[in-house]
Curated annotation (Swiss-Prot):
Subcellular compartments: Cytoplasm; Membrane
UniProt record similarity statement: Belongs to the endophilin family.
Tissue specificity: Expression is abundant in central nervous system (brain lobes and the ventral nerve cord) starting at embryonic stage 13 through to third instar larvae. Also expressed in photoreceptors in the eye imaginal disks and the Bolwig organs of the peripheral nervous system.
Name of the protein in its database record: Endophilin-A
Effect of K129R: In RNA edited version
Gene that this polypeptide is encoded by: EndoA
GO biological process: autophagosome assembly; cellular response to starvation; clathrin-dependent synaptic vesicle endocytosis; endocytosis; membrane bending; membrane tubulation; plasma membrane tubulation; regulation of synapse structure or activity
Species of provenance: Drosophila melanogaster (Fruit fly)
Keyword terms of this UniProt record: Coiled coil, Cytoplasm, Endocytosis, Membrane, Phosphoprotein, SH3 domain
Top-level lineage group: Eukaryota
Function: Required presynaptically at the neuromuscular junction. Implicated in synaptic vesicle endocytosis.
Every SH3 domain range: 305-364
Sequence segments annotated as region (Disordered): 266-295
Length: 369
């Protein structure tokens, strides 16, 4: 910074402290300007908070959001593009119903068929929710972000510049500088005042565009709920048909089988041909004790030890959401390999991501993880 510029900054700082501590009077702007400043400050807070709350509305699970942010950050660091979509609750429930409906068997179970129908409906609702997310991000969140990073940023820049030039002007007047210096400072002060006023006015008088964005948001929500209502109406009719089908089916008769029906052949404890219990042979060996033998108990331990894990070589403090903190010598359970440099693991009931260079793998993950 040149000496003249440094001197100007010192003078402005001196004027600021004189006004705050010494009671000096600075140039006062009118009430209309101060009201525009207040509304602009509220708009800055509104845009920041509205973006945050809208994202939480679309993706309410904070753990899933943190995991997505961590994966996105790791992908940027590693230079690898990684597919990363928010797990819609409708989709998770749909997957559960579809999986177990097919396991039960749709051929013989109306309940299994109903589960599959319900799962397919929820899957459609999850797809509709993804469309809602894309619509809101494109037509509501992106304009807000543009407003925050361009319009508001420009207005706040003019306001900051206005404050600096006002201090410079008042400092030159207080110190009774040369007339041409005071006039030059006054001209710059007036120029910044004009730019700040026009910028704030244009921002605050743009209601048409802002309300249009709210209309788009409301229309997207209406379309989402309308499509979901159509899906649920069809599902309700289908499930009522399945209920009627289940009620009209004849009830199957079931006769439990006996040991004789199973053609068991052997010694004591069986049944005679007439169905009466046979006597236990005195030579028959006694039943084994239900107590677990030491050999069986010990056999469980190695399996537990074979769980993929690693030992921390150093302390790790997270820098991003979703990362896992741990201390040196902690034993961390390995859950997944994110890429060549990062793991996903768990320790002390917490899960998250951590760099491979901070740990020594003791039991590696199976191939493919």
């Amino acid at each position: 910074m040149a000496f003249a510029g440094l001197k100007k900054q010192i003078n402005k700082a001196n004027q600021y402290m004189t006004e705050k501590m010494g009671g000096a009077e600075g140039t006062k702007l009118d009430m209309d300007f101060m009201e525009m400043e207040r509304k602009t400050d509220v708009t800055v807070e509104l845009v920041e908070e509205l973006q945050l709350k809208t994202k939480e509305f679309l993706q309410p699970n904070p753990t899933a959001r943190a995991k997505m942010a961590a994966v996105k950050g790791i992908s940027k660091l590693s230079g690898q593009a990684k597919s990363n979509t928010y797990p819609q609750p409708e989709g998770l429930l749909a997957e559960c119903m579809l999986t177990y409906g097919k396991k039960l068997g749709e051929d013989n179970s109306v309940f299994a068929q109903a589960l599959v129908e319900f799962g397919e409906a929820l899957k459609q609702m999850a797809d509709v929710k993804y469309s809602l997310d894309d619509n809101i991000k494109q037509n509501f969140l992106e304009p807000l972000h543009h407003m925050q990073t361009k319009d508001l940023k420009e207005v706040m820049h003019h306001r900051k510049k206005l404050q600096g030039r006002r201090l410079d002007f008042d400092c030159k007047r207080r110190r009774q500088a040369k007339d041409d210096e005071i006039r030059g400072a006054e001209d710059k002060f007036g120029e910044s005042l004009q730019l700040a006023q026009v910028g704030m006015f244009n921002l605050l008088e743009n209601d048409t565009e802002h309300v249009s964005q709210l209309v788009t948001f409301a229309e997207a929500l209406y379309d989402f709920h309308s499509q979901c209502a159509d899906v649920l109406r069809g599902l309700q009719e289908t499930l009522q048909e399945k209920r009627s089908e289940a009620e009209s089916r004849p009830r199957n008769e079931f006769v439990p089988k006996t040991l004789l029906d199973l053609n068991l052949d052997g010694g004591g404890g069986g049944l005679n041909e007439d169905g009466t219990p046979s006597h236990i042979s005195s030579s028959a060996s006694p039943l084994p004790s239900p107590m677990r033998s030491p050999a069986k108990s010990m056999a469980v331990t190695p399996q537990r030890q074979q769980q993929p894990c690693c030992q921390a070589l150093y302390d790790f403090e997270p820098e991003n959401p979703g990362e896992l903190a741990f201390k040196e010598n902690d034993i961390i359970t390995l859950l997944n390999r994110v890429d060549d440099n990062w793991f996903e693991g768990a320790v002390n009931g917490r899960t998250g991501y951590f760099p491979q260079s901070y740990v020594q793998v003791q039991v590696p993950l199976p191939n493919g993880n």
